Each structure stands twice: as C-alpha cells, then as structure tokens.
C-alpha cells in the first residue's frame, strides 16, 4: 500500500474535508464532517484536525496543507490576502505556517480586490482556480465557481485580474425559507421542472432590473394559475442564477467560453443555465480542482 506524503484540507465555514495524498497524488483516505470554521472555533482547530488525522492513522510528522476559512481573521491563523492582480503562483509562495504544532501545517492565503468601487475577497476559491487552471495557464479565462457565495474571476496568463462575488446560494436559502415565497415551496419534493428553471433563467438574464418583480411572480403565478411547490422552487433557483449570469457575463469575455468549476447539483443547474443561454462552458469538478490545487501547494512547499 502507498504511503501518505501529506494531508490536504479544505476547511470551509461549515464543512471540513481531508484527504491523505500519496507521492503520485492519489487519494489514500478521505474524511468529511460539518466541523467548519464556526464549529472548529469552539472545539479548537488543532483538536478537530488531530481527530481526523487520528481516524486515518496519519503519522505524527505528516505535514498538512490547508485552504479556506481556517486562514480567515476569525479562523485558526490568519493567512492574509494576495492583492489583485494576483498571479496564481503567489498562492504557492505565501503559505502561512501554524505555530506551536508538532507537525508542519501550512495555510494558503486568499485573494483580495482592493477596489473602493468593487471591494471583494475570496478564501478557498483561489485554490480551486489554481487547481483548475494551473500556474502556467495561458490566454484569457472567465471562471465561474458556484456556491453559497459564487465567484466569477477573470484570469489572464495565470493572473487573477478581477473577480466578483454573488450571494446566489445564500439568497436562495433566505428567499425560499424566510420570505412570502416560503409558502410557494412548502412540501416541495425532489421532482425537477427543467422548463420552469430554464424559463426563469432567460427572464432574469434578459430583464435583471425586474429581479424583485420576477421573484414575486413565482408566488402570484402559483396563486392565480396553480403550479407545484417543486416548480416554484425551480423558478426561484432559475431566477437567482439567471441574475448572476447576467452580471457575470456582462462586458468583455475571453472568447473561449466559461470555465465552470462545480460539482453535484450545482454543476447540473449551472450547466443547464449556460446551455439555455447558448453559452459554451467547460466543466471541471470542483472537488478535484481544490484537491489538485492543494497538491500543487504541497509539492511547492515540501518538494514532494
């Protein structure tokens, strides 16, 4: 059996993922939990990490590379930001060591856009960009990373020129649970209404100024003409994703389509949205991208 060379950790706000990686970059063991930054701040970051390392029988001196919210100001050790324009190679060079630990633990920095008119930050997504594009990426790329807070980044020659964050996932959660539209989606089952989703994407993309009105129409249409809770859910999702795409696709584009870094249900929804709008999109699995980015960092730090 192959021997682990390092552990790679993606530490989000509400989630934790760890992989034991061998010399060839293969995954030997995997751990997942809901012990994200919020939980780890209470339990102790070192204790949470050690519990997962113990569960996979990791050696006491096994090095660990971490990306995500463990490096936030409220996290374990603040890893700071690289300012745009930020070359992806800088991520490899500016990992921050965690002091006072028996093993070598490094946390990767985030990226900041210090523009008074469009301030923005990312932490964790930079590692996905690194894994998706590589440090030697040539040409122009527009990258969409869906999530609770979706990121759109414009990358030129391996340098993140600009990026923007959209609270699409969080808005979907709030709108569908905490507003009048919660009544429209009550008891929604798993059935999909692809046509409702596609129609909502197009309407929002073509008339983003009507965002608030389009959302209310989900409820009024159901009251006046009927429709299932599942269909209403798909309309809300399509509306919010359509609004995001209207902004993300605005302005100059690379000419080579969109690089979509996503997994699971989000990958399916965003790919359908791009196809509906006749926008070419190349899909890269988000989990593979973050793992590849962490591996690139480990190789640069420890010359694995």
Could you tell me what each predicted segment is?
Residues 40, 111-205:
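Glycine-rich phosphate-binding loop plus the immediately following alpha-helix
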Residues 61-72, 147, 241, 254-264:
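Short glycine-rich phosphate-binding loop at a beta-alpha junction
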Residues 22-26, 101, 154-159:
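Short acidic-glycine loop/turn motifs at beta-strand connectors
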Residues 16, 23, 180-304:
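ATP-binding/phosphotransfer module of carbohydrate and carboxylate kinases, centering on a glycine-rich
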Residues 9-15, 69, 145-149, 168, ...:
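A short acidic Gly-Thr/Ser loop motif
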Residues 56-119, 157:
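Short beta-strand-loop/turn "lid" adjacent to the catalytic site in phosphate-handling enzymes
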Residues 27-62, 71-78, 183-184:
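N-terminal phosphate-binding loop and adjacent alpha-helix
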Residues 6-44, 284:
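Short glycine-rich, Thr/Ser-proximal phosphate-binding strand/loop in the N-terminal lobe
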